[in-house]
Regions:
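N-terminal secretory signal peptides that target proteins for export/translocation
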Residues: 1-9
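Bacterial N-terminal signal peptides
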Residues: 14-23
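Boundary at the C-terminal end of the N-terminal hydrophobic targeting segment
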Residues: 28-32
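Early exported N-terminus immediately downstream of N-terminal targeting peptides
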Residues: 33-101
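C-terminal partner/receptor-binding element of secreted or periplasmic proteins
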Residues: 40, 156-182
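Extracytoplasmic
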Residues: 50-53, 80-85, 110, 122-124, ...
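Short Gly/Thr-rich strand-loop-strand
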Residues: 102, 106-132, 178-181
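A short, solvent-exposed beta-edge/loop patch
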Residues: 128-163
Length: 182
């Protein structure tokens, strides 16, 4: 009697585990489709083989490892909600390649909502989201132009509160840099 009950329980647990795995796989493939549809990610993927490009995609374990380094940047405000992160930087590319990339990036970023722009020394940093301020959004893009262009794409579940926290940290760090320069 006990053995039959144990076998039934084992079978039920196996079925429940299989259902959970199918559910997880469906959720992961839905996330994969969402990423593939992102115009900013598509732009970065199309430029991946360009000379002078440094790019990195962080997700899963690699993203968890990188969270320690994020503690010193404004990104710490969103690190708990971050699912995926793309980093793309033009360092040694030809000037013409960089001009073409900037033109393509500006076309893609026109479809996003511009949230903030900071001009410091020789660099301009612009923050975009794929939604409206006040809504929940799942993609945030930090676009930096200077000698060399870089773009960081953050994917996850974000709110306006995350933007406010990032801005507060950024302002505090900017003030600290100005006082140390003097």
């Amino acid at each position: 009697m006990i053995n039959a009950f144990g076998r039934r329980m084992k079978n039920m647990l196996t079925i429940m585990l299989a259902i959970m795995m199918i559910s997880i796989c469906q959720h992961a493939s839905a996330d994969g489709k969402k990423v593939a549809e992102s115009p900013a990610v598509t732009l970065l993927e199309s430029r991946r083989d360009m000379k002078g490009i440094k790019d990195m995609k962080l997700e899963g374990f690699m993203l968890k490892m990188a969270k320690g380094a994020m503690k010193k940047s404004p990104v710490v405000a969103i690190s708990d909600n971050l699912d995926r992160m793309y980093i793309f930087a033009i360092e040694d590319a030809s000037e013409m390649d960089e001009v073409h990339f900037r033109a393509d990036a500006e076309k893609v970023l026109a479809g996003y909502t511009k949230v903030a722009e900071v001009v410091e020394d020789h660099a301009t940093t612009i923050l975009y989201i794929n939604g409206q301020v006040g809504d929940t959004f799942n993609e945030m893009i930090m676009y930096v132009t200077r000698p060399g262009t870089s773009m960081m794409i953050f994917q996850g579940e974000f709110t306006t509160d995350h933007l406010v926290k990032m801005n507060e940290i950024s302002e505090r760090q900017r003030k600290e840099r100005k006082t140390t320069k003097r």
